[in-house]
């Protein structure tokens, strides 16, 4: 099998390919970029001739010499300073092995055989590679090219204040990858630990703060975790959420408010993607190779450019890019033949639907037939909104979502003052931990249920996240007994709400409450009583594909004008580098992905040996809960302590510090985490679901799978261990060195 790699520096618009290969920076090498190269530019909707290039023996060679590529036209506008997007670009991360597979356009078996059995395996067709290696911001279909662009107007970027960061010699002390709630929490906790704003640099491919709440702006968007515990730093900012579950716009503006309060706007580098992090042992620093995507005042018409390669260094690096950053696009046959409109919920097209994120009145859908593919948490929120405006709505469901009732309400200022603020200092953390206790069956009988919502009424979810009772031999019987009333109540609610019996039965989720992340909504099931809304239950294979007129399920065609892909995000690998799509090379030149191939070894789930001064909040060997903001906050607090104490020991000279786990330290922690794997035994009773072993932790090697699992005793146990470790002051399990001009000590 061959290895194929996407080349990030691709053709400029209208460039005569016959005149030479793609332009590369003078210092470009595959090792620095994190990719090897295979470039294939193919026909665009059958209209444009194409050329292939390959690099062989350090020289570019043209494989087939044809004509020039015309300027690329997007949505009727000439796109300037935007890389040409090949029809089926090859985009394969470093070290990923690509095997032949059926092409989405239906390449014949004979053709595939010729392509894969050629004398030079390095020139495999992009048609084959494209299906195996689906990129994040580059798609195998020209129809879905909008996933490669930021559709939102600039509101938070000072485009003039970042020019100094473009110099290759730029150095920052602490690099934070991600500017969502996770990245902001790390920045704030580091500032509170005594570091200055000038010590920090936040880098994000988005055009502003917010992370998943920056990219997602679809109608009906809200967080289904109570906003009083999910929205970080409420106590410090003094912000009162407008509702128990606030809409997405408020979450995004809250992220911007956090950045403003701690004056982080000038310490953020947006529309920038880090491709490679490489440890420089001699310089005791990370070398970051990045690509600036440019600043666009109107993403659909191009912009003022400003993109290009960027290299800088950092003493410490924190990967805080989160898990919901890679839109999942189904490999649908016939996408490019569909004559209607299509987009993903992560890049909502209000130009087509009408409305805006602040006022999603989709008046342009009146008279339109809309098809929604997917029934996960995103679809549950967006389907009722689409039903309000469309002429006809067809929902295509493979497996039903587990949807509980969400009782949202406006926040009463009097209640807020008399109940929330009255709890005193630390109220948000206490409320969060109360929530954690109830969803992990760790609450004492006398404990008041402060959040009191669908989550805290579904304690069987403990089987997916760990808890104090999970280690008991009879836990599976216990959790099934706890879950049975919830399951029966959910079935009764659907049957009493949905008038059509066939539709009602199709909407019933029979899985245990811990097998798939639950959803919560007001009015989802009622939507299916509307005369213009239909539910199509597919088989396990899902939708067959698209035709020029609509969506195919088997041989049946459902004609639609718009296809909405509510297919969620690709959770992908549990390796932090893979999840962030960064090639991370450690002190021995070993890629993090390679080290994690046999299962991770970590200290506290936030560091791994061989990758000095690198931190990564995640789920492997760490405590988890449904409230990801709490997880980020606890990790940020812990990492800030480690860096702060090490800096104090070094006399304040942060650039001299080199920190990594000892071999014994990470072995001990990993052993302790693996010893608690029985806490997740109940997940073996599940089928396919985003929290099951079969889906997220599947491995032919049981030990590898066990190393990827969270801390089995739950979040409270994990936090208690970390607090005791910090209180001891010994920094046990860490190898801390202080570099000087004479070496390290």
Curated annotation (Swiss-Prot):
InterPro entries documented for this protein: FAD-binding_Monooxygenases, FAD/NAD-bd_sf
Membrane topology: Single-pass membrane protein
Site (Transition state stabilizer): 517
Biological process per Gene Ontology, one example term: dehydroaustinol biosynthetic process
Binding residue positions for FAD: 212-215, 224-225, 230
Residue ranges crossing the lipid bilayer per the database entry: 174-194
Transmembrane in keyword set: yes
GO molecular function: monooxygenase activity
Similarity-based family: Belongs to the FAD-binding monooxygenase family.
Protein name as annotated: FAD-binding monooxygenase ausB
UniProt organism field: Emericella nidulans (strain FGSC A4 / ATCC 38163 / CBS 112.46 / NRRL 194 / M139) (Aspergillus nidulans)
């Amino acid at each position: 099998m061959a290895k194929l790699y996407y080349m990030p520096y691709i053709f400029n618009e209208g460039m005569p390919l016959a005149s030479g290969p793609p332009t590369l920076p003078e210092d470009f090498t595959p090792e620095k970029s994190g990719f090897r190269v295979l470039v294939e530019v193919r026909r665009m909707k059958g209209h444009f001739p194409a050329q292939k290039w390959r690099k062989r023996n350090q020289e570019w060679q043209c494989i087939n010499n044809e004509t020039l590529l015309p300027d690329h036209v997007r949505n009727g506008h000439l796109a300037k300073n935007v890389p040409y997007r090949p029809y089926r670009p090859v985009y394969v991360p470093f070290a990923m092995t690509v095997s032949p597979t059926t092409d989405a356009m239906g390449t014949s078996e004979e053709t595939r055989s010729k392509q894969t059995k050629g004398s030079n395996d390095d020139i495999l067709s992009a048609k084959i590679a494209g299906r195996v290696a689906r990129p994040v911001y580059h798609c195998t279909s020209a129809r879905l090219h909008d996933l490669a662009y930021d559709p939102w107007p600039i509101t938070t970027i000072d485009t003039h204040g970042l020019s100094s960061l473009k110099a290759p010699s730029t150095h920052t002390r602490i690099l934070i990858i991600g500017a969502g709630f996770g990245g902001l929490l790390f920045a704030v906790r580091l500032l509170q630990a005594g570091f200055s704003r000038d010590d920090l640099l936040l880098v994000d491919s988005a055009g502003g703060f917010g992370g998943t709440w920056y990219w997602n702006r679809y109608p009906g968007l809200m967080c289904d975790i109570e906003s009083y515990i999910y929205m970080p730093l409420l106590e410090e900012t003094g912000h009162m959420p407008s509702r128990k579950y606030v809409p997405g716009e408020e979450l995004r503006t809250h992220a911007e408010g956090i950045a403003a309060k701690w004056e982080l706007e000038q310490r953020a580098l947006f529309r920038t993607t880090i491709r490679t992090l490489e440890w420089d042992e001699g310089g005791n620093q990370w070398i970051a190779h990045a690509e600036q995507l440019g600043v666009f005042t109107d993403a659909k018409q191009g912009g003022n450019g400003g993109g290009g390669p960027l290299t800088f260094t950092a003493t410490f690096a924190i990967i805080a890019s989160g898990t919901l950053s890679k839109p999942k696009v189904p490999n649908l046959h016939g996408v490019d033949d569909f004559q209607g409109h299509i987009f993903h919920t992560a890049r909502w097209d209000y130009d087509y639907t009408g409305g805006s994120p602040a006022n999603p009145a989709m008046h342009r859908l009146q008279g339109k037939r809309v098809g929604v593919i997917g029934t996960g948490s995103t679809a549950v929120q967006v389907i009722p909104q689409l039903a309000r405006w469309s002429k006809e709505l067809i929902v295509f469901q493979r497996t039903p979502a587990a949807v509980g009732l969400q009782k949202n309400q406006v926040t009463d200022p009097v209640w807020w003052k008399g109940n929330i603020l009255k709890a005193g200092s630390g109220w948000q953390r206490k409320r969060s931990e109360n929530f954690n206790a109830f969803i992990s069956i760790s609450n004492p009988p006398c404990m008041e249920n402060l959040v009191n919502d669908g989550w805290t009424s579904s304690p069987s979810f403990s089987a997916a996240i760990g808890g104090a009772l999970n280690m008991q031999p009879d836990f599976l019987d216990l959790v099934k007994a706890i879950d049975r009333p919830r399951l029966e109540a959910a079935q009764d609610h659907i049957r009493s709400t949905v008038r059509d019996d066939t539709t009602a039965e199709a909407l019933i989720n029979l899985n245990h409450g811990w097998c798939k992340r639950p959803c919560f909504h007001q009015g989802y099931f009622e939507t299916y009583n509307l005369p213009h809304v239909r539910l199509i239950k597919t088989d396990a294979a899902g939708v067959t594909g698209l035709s020029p007129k609509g969506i195919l399920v088997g041989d049946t065609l459902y004609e639609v004008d718009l296809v909405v892909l509510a297919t969620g995000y690709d959770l992908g690998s549990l390796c932090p580098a893979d999840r962030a799509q960064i090639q991370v090379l450690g002190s021995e030149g070993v890629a993090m992905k390679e080290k994690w191939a046999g299962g991770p070894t970590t200290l506290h789930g936030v560091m791994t040996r061989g990758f000095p001064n690198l931190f990564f909040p995640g789920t492997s060997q760490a405590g988890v809960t449904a409230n990801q903001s709490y997880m980020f906050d606890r990790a940020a607090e812990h990492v800030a302590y480690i860096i702060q104490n090490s800096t104090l020991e070094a006399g304040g000279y942060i650039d001299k510090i080199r920190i990594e786990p000892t071999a014994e330290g990470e072995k001990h922690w990993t052993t302790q985490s693996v010893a608690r794997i029985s806490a997740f035994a109940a997940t073996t009773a599940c089928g396919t679901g985003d929290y099951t072993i079969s889906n997220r932790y599947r491995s032919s090697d049981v030990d590898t799978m066990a190393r990827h699992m969270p801390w089995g005793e739950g979040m409270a146990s994990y936090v208690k261990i970390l607090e005791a470790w910090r209180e001891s002051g010994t920094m046990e399990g860490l190898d801390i060195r202080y570099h000087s001009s004479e070496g390290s000590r």
